[in-house]
A protein has these predicted regions:
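Amphipathic alpha-helical polymerization modules
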Residues: 1-50, 96-173
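Extended alpha-helical coiled-coil "stalk/arm" regions
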Residues: 35-74
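Amphipathic alpha-helical assembly segments
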Residues: 61-121
Length: 173
């Protein structure tokens, strides 16, 4: 009877071990994809080529980030542009010509847009760091659980093998 119980336990532990190994492989892939995406965000600007080269698991997040970064940068630019334009007009006064004013206005808008994109990238990097820490913690828990299951599996196999030896008929001559 003990042989059956130990055999069932060994089978269950092998199943648990395979599930944990699958989770570890999935977590490792997620961490690798997130690090690749993090590198992409850290470079500053994302092009369509970068988007196409990003991991498929991060495509949705990349698209969401692009929309968020653009909208956030536009909002930042629209909020700060009038103040900067007014400061420039006060400094230059009547000395500027219309072409120079248009060029400066364009420069102000591009600069503020870039600052807004940088701010969005910083927010995304913080979010990515938190997600990476969460994944690393979950991976560590799974690795600990795998070690425990492996030890229990080893003990169950030894107990099963010992029970088989004890159950075997002993012939004496």
């Amino acid at each position: 009877m003990g042989i059956l119980i130990f055999s069932a336990r060994v089978s269950d532990l092998i199943h648990q071990k395979h599930q944990i190994e699958y989770k570890l492989a999935r977590l490792t892939r997620q961490m690798r994809d997130m690090q690749q995406y993090s590198t992409l965000i850290g470079n500053g600007s994302i092009s369509i080529g970068d988007l196409l080269n990003s991991p498929s698991s991060m495509m949705g997040r990349t698209m969401n980030y692009l929309g968020y970064a653009h909208n956030s940068a536009l909002q930042y630019m629209q909020a700060n542009a009038p103040m900067m334009q007014q400061m420039y007009a006060q400094q230059m006064g009547a000395q500027q010509n219309p072409q120079q004013a248009a060029m400066m206005n364009n420069y102000i808008m591009r600069t503020l847009y870039a600052q807004g994109r940088d701010r969005a990238a910083q927010v995304e990097m913080r979010n990515l760091k938190e997600a990476e820490e969460r994944l690393a913690q979950e991976k560590e828990q799974q690795e600990t659980l795998l070690a425990e299951v492996s030890e229990e599996l080893k003990a169950a196999k030894q107990a099963r093998d010992q029970d088989i030896k004890d159950f075997a008929p002993k012939y004496t001559a």
